[in-house]
Regions:
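C-terminal motif of bacterial Sec signal peptides marking the signal peptidase cleavage site
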Residues: 27-31
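Catalytic-loop region of hydrolases
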Residues: 33-120
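Accessory cap/linker subdomain of secreted extracellular hydrolases
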Residues: 51-55, 60, 66-67, 245-339
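Short, surface-exposed "cap/lid" segments of acyl-processing enzymes
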Residues: 102-160
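Alpha/beta-hydrolase active-site loop
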Residues: 181-203
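Primarily recognizes the serine-hydrolase "nucleophile elbow" in alpha/beta-hydrolase
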Residues: 196-265
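C-terminal catalytic histidine-bearing segment of alpha/beta-hydrolase fold enzymes
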Residues: 330-331, 357, 364-416
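Short beta-strand/loop motif that positions the catalytic acidic residue
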Residues: 343, 348-355
Length: 416
């Protein structure tokens, strides 16, 4: 990972203007898995109230505060700064907030909160927690840093509904430590704790506990885990619906499918992320020396550049053992597979039938599994749509589904 000096220089160069959330960048790549281990569900976390975070000017370096901060509870806000120059009908805040690692350590996570203009209604505003797709593992890939993001099209429908829009970067993206890519517990905690952060800001956001979770690709995986974890990890939140777009699932199947895929660099990213999250996940058990050397690029560049780097080599040059056949990797593939526990809310799964990254059959198998355990779930597929291309065509139906959940209507289910 880049050293502290490199990280701070990059952040100061990006500055505070032109952020525009970086949300679209988050959609481009598939998600990884997370852990559904007992550690993720047994945490005794509690609600947080309004706090007194450090207030920063737009040109100050918020991320530097993640290097040294006072202990706090999940969701408490460490620092906040208003972001100028973003063309949305609301106020954009960049935040640094407390969350919890898989091991239970207090970690600082960055993200974005967008607050609609005007006064909040009686009872507070509903919250939409957005979980982004794969951007990379390097600090510079954190969406809240991105000056060219064009997420206005995603944000505006929720601002029009007077909802607070929150978007986590996830643990280790923009902040110290390697990002635990595809580690469900870490992703889920970050996704829930930024809702707590919005609530902790009190009248500044007017956020209530009523929450909808939405994510695509890696983010689809993240919100499925957040939904599974919510009742135990964040019981004060009222999660009413979860929308998972093209979520990575059936991880053992996907790991095998990536063997001859141009997206096989996801194997390297996942190996790096799980090695960061799980001390026993020895890289040499799954990666060749060349594959391990290429992880230097994982820590320096973002997803698009990683694809070009890994595509120069054949699978056999990078992978020494099939992760399905060596421990603890085989177990981690299962533990980080979503859909084994009933979540707090009904689930809508969206998938393009021409998805080139996450096989569309995987979400059908996921629905079958979720039905077997009693999870209310509906799956909608879109003919001719790709991994990221499905987002636009599915948006009107998704918004209708969210509106119905917020209105208290019962959700349809594919389960007999």
């Amino acid at each position: 990972m880049p050293n502290g000096a490199t990280r701070v220089t990059a952040r100061r160069r990006l500055g505070g203007v032109g952020l525009a959330l970086g949300v679209v960048v988050l959609l481009a790549a598939p998600a990884c898995n997370d852990d559904s281990s007992d550690d993720g569900e047994a945490s005794d976390s509690s609600a947080v109230g309004p706090s007194a975070p450090v207030e920063l000017a737009p040109d100050e370096d918020l991320y530097a505060l993640a290097e040294d901060f006072q202990p706090g509870e999940p969701g408490e806000v460490i620092a906040v700064q208003e972001v100028e120059g973003v063309d949305v009908d609301g106020t954009v805040l960049r935040v640094l907030y407390h969350s919890e690692s898989i091991e239970g350590d207090d970690v600082a996570v960055s993200g974005i909160i967008v607050v609609p203009d005007g006064d909040a209604p009686v009872g507070g505003r509903n919250v939409l927690s957005w979980a982004h797709g794969t951007t990379g593992i390097a600090d510079k890939c954190a969406p809240s840093l991105d000056p060219s993001g064009a997420g206005v099209g995603l944000v505006e429908p929720f601002l029009e509904r007077d909802m607070v829009f929150v978007a986590t970067d996830y643990e280790g993206l923009g902040t110290p430590g390697r990002h635990p890519y595809i580690a469900g517990v870490s992703e889920g905690r970050g996704t829930l704790d930024i809702v707590r952060a919005a609530i902790a800001l009190g009248d500044r956001t007017g956020a209530s506990e009523r929450t909808v979770l939405w994510g695509h690709s890696q983010g689809g995986h993240a919100v499925l885990f957040a939904n599974q974890m919510a009742s135990d990890y964040a019981p004060e939140l009222d999660v009413v619906g979860t929308v998972a777009g093209a979520p990575p699932s059936q991880l053992p199947l996907i790991a095998a499918a990536l063997r001859d895929s141009p997206y096989r660099y996801y194997l390297g990213m996942t190996a790096a992320g799980w090695n960061a999250a799980y001390p026993d996940a020895d890289l040499s058990l799954v990666l060749t020396p060349l594959g391990i050397d290429l992880l230097d690029e994982v820590d320096e560049v973002c997803a698009g550049e990683l694809g070009a780097a890994w595509s120069r080599y054949e699978y056999e040059e990078l992978i020494t053992n099939d992760p399905n056949e060596v421990e603890p990797w085989a177990t981690l593939l299962v533990e980080n597979d979503p859909g084994y526990e009933v979540g707090a809310s009904p689930v809508l799964i969206i998938h393009g039938e021409n998805d080139e990254q996450i096989p569309v059959v995987s979400s059908q198998l996921l629905v079958t599994r979720m039905c077997e355990i009693g999870q209310d779930v509906e799956r909608r597929t879109y003919p001719g749509q790709s991994h990221a291309g499905v987002i636009g065509p599915s948006m009107p139906e998704m918004l209708e589904w969210i509106d119905a959940r917020l209105a208290g209507e019962a959700a349809a289910s594919d389960c007999a």
